[in-house]
Amino acid sequence: MNSTGNTIQTLEWFEHIRLNPEMYIGRIGDGSDVEDGIYTLLKGLIDSSADEFEMGYAKRLGIEISGLAVSLREYGRGIPLESVVNSTSGLSVGIGARKDVVTTNSYKVANALSEEFSFDSYRSVASSWALYSKGCLTDQRIEEDKNLEPDGIRVKFALDKELFPNSYYRLEIVKDILEQYSAKHEGFPISLNGY
C-alpha cells in the first residue's frame, strides 16, 4: 500500500494523548495501586512545584483531591502570563512517560486527559488563565491590575471518566506519595485537603 496525503491522518496534540494515555502515564488501573497512571500524573505535577522549590521560588503547595478532581495551588513565582496557553497545550519534542514520573509536559497531559482543565498564573498585580475541555481551549484571558492572589499558579482538573471509568484517587496512597516528597524536599510544605 502506498502512502499518500489522503491516507495519512494527522492528530491534534491532545487526540494522540487521549488515544494512547498509557504512553504518557503508564497503566490506567483503577487507583488502587501507586503504580496506576493517575498517581504518575499527579507526581509529574508535584515534581514541577518541587523543582520550583529547589530553585528557591515555590514557598508551599496546597493540593485538594476528591474522586478524579484535583486542584493544586503553588505559591511561587507563577509563569509568564503570555505563556499560559503554550505551557498547557501542544507537545514538546521527545516527550513520553517514564515509569515513575511524567515529563515536563505534565500540565499538557493532565489537560488532554481531563473533562475540564484550568490553569491560572498570578504575577504581581496581573493574572492569566486558560480553560480547556478535553484538551480544546475554550477560553483564555490576561487581566492587568486585578489580581489579589499571591503569586504562583493554580491548576484544576477533573480526569475524564470515559478514559478512567473505574478510577479514583485513594487519599491514603496520595498521603504516602506526599510524605516521600516531604522527605526528599525538606522544608517544602505540602498540604492535602487543607491539612
Give residue spans per PLM region.
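GHKL-type ATPase core
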Residues: 1-9, 67-85, 93-195
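C-terminal effector/catalytic modules and regulatory tails appended to multi-domain proteins
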Residues: 1-10, 19, 27-34
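Alpha-helix capping/hinge segments and adjacent helical runs
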Residues: 13-14
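Conserved helix-loop functional segments at active or binding sites
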Residues: 19, 23-26, 51, 55, ...
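Short, hydrophobic secondary-structure boundary micro-motifs
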Residues: 26-27, 191
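Flexible beta-alpha connector loops of hexameric P-loop NTPases
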Residues: 28-36, 95-97, 164
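Conserved ATP-binding N-box helix of the HATPase_c
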Residues: 32-61, 107-113
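Conserved catalytic core of two-component histidine kinases
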Residues: 63-65
